[in-house]
Amino acid sequence: MTLAETFNTENHGNPLITLNYEPALESLGNDYYDEVTAAEFPQLTLRWRNDAILPRLGLNPQIVTDEDFITAFGLFQGRKPLLALRYHGYQFGEYNPNLGDGRGFLYGQVRGTDGELYDFGTKGSGRTPYSRGGDGMLTLKGGVREVLAAEALHQLGVRTSRCLTMIETGLGLWRGDEPSPTRSSVMVRMNKSHIRFGTFERLHYFQRSDLIKKLLDHVIEHYYRHLAHESDKYALFYAELVKRVAELVAQWMAAGFCHAVLNTDNMSITGESFDYGPYAFIPTYNPYFTAAYFDYYGRYCYIQQPSICQWNLEMLQVPLRAVIDKADMEAGLAKFSEYCHAEYNSLMLKKLGFEELKTPEAEELLSLTLKFLQESQVGYHQFFYEMARTFSIKWRDEPGLVLSGSDIVPPSGTDANFDNWCVLYHKILNNFDYEQVKIIAQNLTHYNPKTSLLRPTIEEAWEPIVQEDNWQPFYDLVKSIQSRG
């Protein structure tokens, strides 16, 4: 009996297969993709299903079975064509024309209950014409890490993809940077679009300005619909993309998130965060923290992320000049820093409890906060969580009480900065009445959840899987993230 025969293959009963899929990208023609076949796997075990996002697809989680997930996204029955998307990209600043979906494909596109178009994109589903000698597979740990990153960022308010499901596939993989053989998985990502900056860069490489315009019209039609009937829709599209990307990177920075691989092929044309590889959340405020061991010169370190995203947007201008006036794009890009700075300041103030502050106070508080965090190397997440945990309305009346019951212990030599910060925070609180201070307390709790996704936390969830096939710590961690515990 084959693996497929052990599962119910009556596709008409599988709500994941009978969704109303739209051939939006497929209708563009095969200049943008290759039709591929999914790999066959020796053993399929459902390890994760994201019931939280099924209602957005119009599905009741109670009627979608584990078997439905395996049949749809492990056996890949009932969906054709499967599309490996073509793209190029700047990787660590160097143009690479040998890219494309090398271990995944576009499974399908479906309209959500919100009227938006969503992609189901696989990772680890087998070789494609763009695998470049790779096996087309995803390690189980890679799948686990992407699930955790997406859920954590979503709860922190970052515009991000989500993981719909993760299935263990029974293959042993050999990887130079992991103990091998290591276990394997297929992960299905749900996001607005898998069209990347590098999708346009590839078309420019082949001098296909006609295909650039066709793709740009498609992007505006489906993802910037409010611009579709504007006379200057192309320039407005680029200006809005700049704003989306600037706000996205500000969201990363406030969350203490380091993406690690900000190549142009990892930049979404919708301004979403996706494709999580060797990412990390900063343990302490070190501006030059670098997440990827192979980023030898720190190109994608934490503090460089805004400038790198701005550079990526500048590189995108090259293919888009086939449609959009260069001066219009430069005018749009000129606002990047303004957008990023405004979003970052707003988010950081919220982490400190404030919806808004007068500019001088806001800048002084943010500057002093980052100065203390950098000099003291107190945990980045710990600092804000301890504010939320120990906040008292009495902080308004007495500066000596600010953070007095917390676990924040400033190292020797940083006491003065800490004291200055406490005095300033008290001074600002004193401008608010008691009812407003209660709202500040609520903001602190909302924007600073207890659970953080530092690397040791991920390892604590992963090691029981490796040692005992015990998934409970992983499930507990996901539950804690989703509940903002």
From Swiss-Prot:
Keywords: ATP-binding, Magnesium, Manganese, Metal-binding, Nucleotide-binding, Nucleotidyltransferase, Transferase. NCBIfam families: PRK00029.1. The active site is at D265. It holds the Pfam family SelO. Mg(2+) binds at N266, D275. Disulfide bonds: none annotated. This is Protein nucleotidyltransferase YdiU. Its EC number is 2.7.7.-, 2.7.7.108. ATP binds at G100, G102, R103, K123, D135, G136, R189, R196, D275. Its cofactor is Mg(2+); Mn(2+). The keyword Metal-binding applies. It comes from Nostoc sp. (strain PCC 7120 / SAG 25.82 / UTEX 2576). One of its GO terms (molecular function) is magnesium ion binding. The keyword Oxidoreductase does not apply. Belongs to the SELO family. It comes from the Bacteria. Nucleotidyltransferase involved in the post-translational modification of proteins. It can catalyze the addition of adenosine monophosphate (AMP) or uridine monophosphate (UMP) to a protein, resulting in modifications known as AMPylation and UMPylation. It catalyses: L-seryl-[protein] + ATP = 3-O-(5'-adenylyl)-L-seryl-[protein] + diphosphate; L-threonyl-[protein] + ATP = 3-O-(5'-adenylyl)-L-threonyl-[protein] + diphosphate; L-tyrosyl-[protein] + ATP = O-(5'-adenylyl)-L-tyrosyl-[protein] + diphosphate; L-histidyl-[protein] + UTP = N(tele)-(5'-uridylyl)-L-histidyl-[protein] + diphosphate.
